[in-house]
């Protein structure tokens, strides 16, 4: 019985947008095809970190290999298993594995689908990866912004690129009161105006706009004193951010939460009056969906995939990410609860609408729709085996 092979960077050893997407993608695919019809190959997860409770049994992990050997080992295993098993389809949730998929297709005819997220697409500095992307049977982009980048910057045929928006787990996020424990931990009160950003603090992540938030704070504080900017996330850029805040005289208004485990994210979203990440190169932005599921107003940049996450402004505020005056002005109106946006201060409306647009049931239907030309053959094959 031919299966679908899904190649994934990792699912368990790190957290991030691609990991979250990959988990949801596998869950959706497993409900469409059944886990027995899928083989998963994980590059960076060690075998002892793998814990699949969704019926997946054919999972191969290579994260225990030394870093210098891991990439060639993973590539050789992908090639070997594809050659031996002749899958119906190969899906790679990262563009880096595209050249290997192209080799398989060239020698066996097995079709492949590549999924592009954001920074992986606009930092595609390898000719072999670009060629593999161009030759893919289908490229899926998580937003219109990423899709347009693939078409205009990487020369893809627009007929072979489609959009598969991100999703989230609504049951992990809920509208709730401010946690007294977290208020005490961060030196806040129930009345403190709080702006929240959730992201990794690293040089490569500055496009997410936390610098712009720091630069907007003097104007915000002049109108809404005692405001606190809560940064959730860790990374090597923290010391530079601290210096930036000190240079602007707003260091006391910036609160670093550090690493927060997934199970505590909902509580942190519920601390804030506004979740803000005015990015300018975000592929999509799952954090926007999470904040909206907690009923929180959201501010994002208007030049990237954030537009998709906020449904072109229906779900939140879209600002010029390079204009700190506009950023500050919009935030001030939200903190004063004077913004005219019709949905910002209606938590249940925000939660209901983001779930309708991006909840898992919608995502599952989207996966089935995008992969229908490939899945129909596999479903018929599985039906023949099971009868």
How does the language model describe each region?
Residues 7, 189-208, 214-217:
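Conserved donor-binding/catalytic core segment of Leloir-type glycosyltransferases
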Residues 239-260:
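Nucleotide-activated donor-binding/catalytic signature segment of Leloir-type glycosyltransferases, i.e.
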Residues 259-260, 267-272:
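Short alpha-helical donor nucleotide-sugar binding micro-motif in glycosyltransferases
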Residues 280:
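Aromatic "clamp/platform" in nucleotide-sugar-dependent glycosyltransferases that forms part
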């Amino acid at each position: 019985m031919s299966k679908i092979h899904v190649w994934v960077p990792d699912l368990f050893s790190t957290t991030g947008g691609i990991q979250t997407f990959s988990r949801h993608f596998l869950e959706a695919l497993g409900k469409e095809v059944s886990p027995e019809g899928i083989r998963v190959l994980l590059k960076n997860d060690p075998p002892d970190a793998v814990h699949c409770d969704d019926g997946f049994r054919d999972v191969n992990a290579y994260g225990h290999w030394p870093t210098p050997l891991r990439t060639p080992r993973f590539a050789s295993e992908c090639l070997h298993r594809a050659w031996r098993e002749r899958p119906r389809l190969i899906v790679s949730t990262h563009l880096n594995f595209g050249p290997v998929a192209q080799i398989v297709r060239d020698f066996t005819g097995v079709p492949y689908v590549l999924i592009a997220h954001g920074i992986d697409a606009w930092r595609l500095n390898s000719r072999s990866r670009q060629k593999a992307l161009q030759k893919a049977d289908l490229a899926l982009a998580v937003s219109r912004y990423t899709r347009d980048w693939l078409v205009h910057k990487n020369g893809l045929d627009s007929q072979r690129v489609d959009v598969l928006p991100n999703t989230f787990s609504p049951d992990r996020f809920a509208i709730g009161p401010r946690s007294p424990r977290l208020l005490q931990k961060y030196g806040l009160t129930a009345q403190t105006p709080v702006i929240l950003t959730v992201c990794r603090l690293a040089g490569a992540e500055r496009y997410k706009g936390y610098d712009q938030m720091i630069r907007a704070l003097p104007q915000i504080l002049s109108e809404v004193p005692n405001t606190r900017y809560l940064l959730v996330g860790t990374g090597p850029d923290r010391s530079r951010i601290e210096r930036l805040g000190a240079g602007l005289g707003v260091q006391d208004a910036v609160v670093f939460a550090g690493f927060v485990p997934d199970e505590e994210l909902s509580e942190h979203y519920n601390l804030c009056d506004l979740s803000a990440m005015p990015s300018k190169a975000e592929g999509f932005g799952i954090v926007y969906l999470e904040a909206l599921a907690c009923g929180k107003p959201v501010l994002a940049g208007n030049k990237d995939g954030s537009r998709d996450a906020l449904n072109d402004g229906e779900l939140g505020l879209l600002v010029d990410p390079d204009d700190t005056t506009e950023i500050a002005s919009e935030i001030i109106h939200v903190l004063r609860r004077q913004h005219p946006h019709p949905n910002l201060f209606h938590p249940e409306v925000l939660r209901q609408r983001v779930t309708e647009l991006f909840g898992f049931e919608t995502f599952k239907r989207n996966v089935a729709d995008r992969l229908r030309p490939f899945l129909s053959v596999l479903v018929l094959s599985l039906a023949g085996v099971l009868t």
